[in-house]
């Protein structure tokens, strides 16, 4: 499993200097940085699927599937974001909600800040991570998965948690051309009209890259309708971001 390698990378010894370290193992290609504070940044590609992970975080109480982190995706201010907890990690390893966007941010930035909110009797913790100027190993992993090294659409991505839910889910149909992998996902951002119908949608991230699922998902989204979680009227022109997934199982 790709998450198993990321968990292993997060547990390895600290690297002697600040570089992206390349790893190749059984068809998986990865790049990682390990910091003396115990945090690890990792990007990995396997079978066309690209993931970006943070490792070495304080463990969580309970068994939640997601973890909220404040990150400097729009430096210098921190913004709230929700990450998926890697299996068997107790929250110490989390997967980015938009791996391509985060990877591109790290290759073009000088630093990355992470704040882990307080939980139970543990205080909030903040990490200020300097990034290497040489990102050749990271670029190689992104290229192996067909991830673009630059994308102007990254500028409009908002990682903050949603305040809307589907009142009427989109009419989902199987993609006309199935992705080469058995799993595909698309990150889409839309504005809404006064009735809560999505409009002016943009594909922000797609995994596997260039699988065609993103274009298919873009066509499905406008068939749904959203409403605010608190029951207040939807603000016309408001913007929301959603993730749509597709998976195939063998019978």
Language model feature labels by segment:
Residues 1-11:
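Sec-dependent N-terminal signal peptides
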Residues 13-251:
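Charge-biased low-complexity segments
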